[in-house]
Amino acid sequence: MKKIVLPFLVIVFALVAFTNVDNCSLSYKGIYAFKLDNEHSAILRFYEDGTVLASTSVNDYLDVFTWFHKENKDMVLTGKYKIKKCSIKFEVTGATGTQKYEGTIRGETLEVKLTDEATKKTATRAYTYFPLGL
């Protein structure tokens, strides 16, 4: 019986470990959005080189893709992100100030605590992924 249980446990553990790794990956071909109200969303975009962009926008996400990119730095907050296991941390800066984010990647959702550096106000948000070309 012990000979059967041990290999079974090893297989189950390996499957759980690999599933969690996949669940902790960012998606780079779209945006993460948090609906602020009926008309506006807070948006994030990540790049494989470690760059992150943050802004607010109307809820028409197809329109967002026309201007929300690295080459348009004047209209967005920019920074670098770091991932450790399922945790993510980044700081973005722009004309409107600096914001710090710290949270967890859960599949296509980012659960983060946001801190505005000027006011020290915090907010907890769950951003949802929307692929490019919805």
Q: Predicted segment positions?
A:
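Lipid interaction determinants
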Residues: 18-134
